[in-house]
Amino acid sequence: LNVLKRKLCLGIGDILYSKAMLDSVKNEYDEIHVSPDWAIYDEYCSERGQPYMDFIRFLFGRLFSDKPYILSNEQSFETISALHTGNFKLVKPDIRKYFTKERVFNFPYVVVTTKVRGTPKYLFKNLEELFVETLTNLSKKYNIVLLGERLVGMNKEYKIHGSNIIYSIYDSVRYLPNVLDLTAYSELGITSPTQIDFCRDLNTMAHSVATIAIGCGGNFCLASAIANTIAYSVHGDGELVLNALYRDKEDPTVSVDIDPQKFCDRIANL
């Protein structure tokens, strides 16, 4: 048998990009054993407790249910992630077949995700007035659905980056006209999304006219894997991925801008 064995880093983006990388070579193997890297959980996520471990197992079970994947708990495998790909080439994830179901709403809408990772808060503050004005005008044409956290719980990993790098823009967009607020009350950095809410949010993104994200965190990774996505991202630990897959690419489904005006123009033209 030709067998590949890998552990996966536990960030949402890491899991999605690892899945895409492994999918790109899966026809070369009889079996691909995948395991969560629980050392990452112990170091950065342990305050989330058992519910987060259960959520990770659910996500692995959903994404790696087909052949040649075999779920494992073995911790001796080499670890891969979005930033440490081993010998694999970065590939854009596509998770629509795993999470897209019937429409949640029977009218057109645009999703705005509230969590930001990577783009410094001062850059969002420079963008905020134009961004809110653009969305206010857009709300005359589409409902605006808010997804994500109202308040980001600062776990051990987030504290390393700080609240100027990982934060929520909820207070900036919560009072937009024609808003449908599906944000989470809980601080997901120190709790865990429920399976029901996670699947609902992904399906909501999938059927949106577009999903808007700031930064390069899990919300962008999920959106770009399942929806038409308009993003603004400057700096951040995901820039390697953005540069390789999205910046200056002819991808009709995902745009990532560093120019605030260009970003807002894309939104205005929806």
Segment roles from a protein language model:
Residues 1-78, 202-205, 220-221:
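Active-site and donor-binding regions of nucleotide-sugar-utilizing enzymes
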Residues 5, 111-113, 213-216:
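Structural motif
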Residues 10-13, 40-41, 116-127, 152-153, ...:
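Short acidic, S/G/P-rich loop/turn micro-motifs used as interaction or catalytic elements
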Residues 12-19, 129-242:
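Donor-binding and catalytic core of enzymes assembling or modifying cell-surface/extracellular glycoconjugates
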Residues 39-46, 52-54, 119-121, 151-160, ...:
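Short, charged/polar "capping" segments at the starts of alpha-helices
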Residues 63-116:
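A nucleotide-sugar donor-handling region in carbohydrate enzymes
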Residues 221-270:
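Nucleotide-sugar donor-binding patch of glycosyltransferase catalytic domains
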